[in-house]
């Protein structure tokens, strides 16, 4: 197997150059984000900014808790007074790496965007390490890292921050393959660390990676004779990964089981892939012209990548030293592709995904099985890179000439010499096609509302209310779609400045108490709405007058249960205090 130990052990300042290249690529592929790095956040292909704004709030909450040693981490200030509100969504504790930016700057966008660019650079670097290990070639490793940094799925989902983080997946595969090559215990330990970090950065990716490995890993384990070291290393990896994952996963599972959440089958089916989705891409190239009416998600890695992946698979299977890793990558790809179909996956008249959802904790809560497609695209890039693996090479090669020789040796050995060079340059052209076809369009950007315009009411709330007071931003969302909650996530952004608990909020799941309260306050400020808010512990109502229906605005002065405490100069934002009933003493835990 070409995944040589020395391919990753060459610690040399040259890696700084690689990181610099990936940084330039990350900035260029997300441009013009860098020009508005402290004022806007990318939305990718998201129609609205709800999810990016929610992740912006998540970055702040992790930074806020990091400053307090992560005390009360799960009791996030949303859906108050509900407990463990942060367990309702992706926690992303890895975003704490940009906590100093949050602490020293009022720009939440700056921290968010620096984290995003860092993760894209990490994708490129981790990809180059993995591909270099597979091919024993630094130049091919850089090209592979670039292709993984530009992965179509990531840039399509650029508005979903956690889905931009591939490095955990790539490093897990890298150290796992290294361990199964040489049985070094440090590789087993690092595989466990990488798996754990994968889950921390993106719960979806961590879960999908572990589930796919469960079915694909036996190919790498077959015919391994050193059972003792295999068992020891496997135990180390599992223990280390569990030690990292369980402190996050257990509270999430506990909260989920307490609320008995399961996704609606029609929702999961709607967000599952179909085979035709793998023929569609948003970017340039022949497959981008697909108009198949059945295709809904652009999941294709591109024609050039698909073609080169087939070539790499054939070349990898022909070589003894790459045969097993090629079989593993092929099975990894097939399993991920089938799982991406969700309930639509039919095998011998049965639906395997539904059976798995009954037995595997957490799978029944998965909303978007089509996200398994990211593993399909990663597998295609890795298989394509195997086209460049040398035959029986003991030393890593570092230049383009050597890469060309590796191509000729691996794929043209059985052909006449005059065809070898043509094949060599043909494959180089295909790899260039992969990069060109993967180059994304400019991402959509959401310009954050100006804080200075909101400063008066935010500062009043921060100085005139108690830290434990509960605030309701009104009106509440009336719908259930993501777009209906954009105003709510803007309110969550302002809460990062006034730091008061919110009665409303947005998350992957919603507490039942909030769902009931939401239904009860749709006619605010009628008596029922105010009484229900009061019973929920709400003391302050921040009312966006422009968003409230005109008849309801007219009701505000006549509502005896509310007293106006503050109004902005333009009259658009009012803060009301909910008056307690007679002989009622406000008490808060």
Predicted regions and their residues:
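Hydrophobic alpha-helical membrane-interfacial segments at the cytosolic entry of transmembrane helices
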Residues: 17-24, 193-194, 226-250, 327-335, ...
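Periplasmic/ER-lumenal interhelical loops and adjacent helix-loop junctions
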Residues: 44-65, 246-316, 361, 365, ...
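Membrane-embedded helix bundles of polyisoprenyl
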Residues: 22, 115-134, 138-221, 237-241, ...
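Membrane-interface coil-to-helix junctions
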Residues: 25-123, 147, 151-156, 160-166, ...
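Signature aromatic-anchored transmembrane alpha helix within multi-pass, membrane-resident enzymes
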Residues: 214, 234-242, 382, 388-438
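Hydrophobic, aromatic-rich transmembrane alpha-helices
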Residues: 302-338, 389
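Perimembrane helix-loop-helix junctions
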Residues: 4-6, 178-180, 209-242, 313-322, ...
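Extracytoplasmic
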Residues: 261-272, 429-589
